[in-house]
Amino acid sequence: TDSTATAVADGSGVMTITSDGFTCKELTSAAGNVSTGSMCCWQWHCDAGDRITFNESGANPGGIRQTNATAGISIIRYTGTGSNGTIAHGLGKAPEFLIFKRGNATNIWAVWNVALGDDLKLVLNSADAQDADGAFMNSTLPTSTNITVGGASTNTNADGGDYLCYAFSSIQGYSKFGSYVGNGSGTSDGT
């Protein structure tokens, strides 16, 4: 996630997917199982839910979605339309955390959290502060059924863009999303 590069098929790191994770090939570069490097891996188990294919309809993108509402996660792959549109997420409640990445062009990892409101976003692969970007979700908060993607944003809905969106809602025992203000004392109240 420290790159804005396009997605590439690279079989140099992961060797096998297993029932409880994966194994890596032995490598001498930062692409996989290197004994002297730091690695980060994010995994979400989503196959216990529904897999839905949806068609482009007007300004609304088409694609495929795997949703596990019990765990509060929906993984959505879609093709952008270049116009303000909506995508059904299948969670049954409004997502509180979204990550978007365009795979067929150099682009940021655009991130939204419920604490940001409808006009701000963060960049996952950056130390930058939040920035105002109403085009990102067309200044529209997610609802219990849909995520809005802005047509003026290459981060979420450029015409022909190949996108991946991770949508999360807080589910007790699985996850919690919100914010906190640090106070320098080692304890803080989160919301």
State the predicted function of each range:
Residues T1-T191:
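Surface-exposed molecular-recognition determinants
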